[in-house]
Amino acid sequence: MIQVFCARRGSGKTKRLIELANHQQLEAKGDSVYIDDDSRPMLQLNRSIRFIDTMEYGVRDCSDFYGMLCGIISSNYDIENIYIDGLFNIINCTMKESAQLIKRIANLTDRFGINVYINININGSEEVPEGIK
């Protein structure tokens, strides 16, 4: 399952994603991974949630990010939830490219039974593609 949260910067998406991760970790049977482009949320997360700062790995585009996700999933078969905070802060891509990436991630989630939650910052003038809704 994949769930995408789209809203303007500063609307509280990160806070809600952290709360969701911490709450779900209490009942999760598998492992959880939280992916962000900076380490600030790390101290707010339950310590059993694996935190990954993408700045440490040089992730720049959709291909890099998808490869990193595949590596994370292939290295731990017990992953149940993945939380991605600020996708457009992590990678440089267009809304159309991100829709294609999200479709590829959705295929991964179906194949491996993983839940993925993604925060995306949008401008008021940007229209969210159908593939992301």
Regions found by a protein language model. Give the residues of each.
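Conserved P-loop
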Residues: 1-72, 127-129
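Active-site nucleophile-His-acid catalytic modules used for acyl/amide transfer and hydrolysis
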Residues: 76
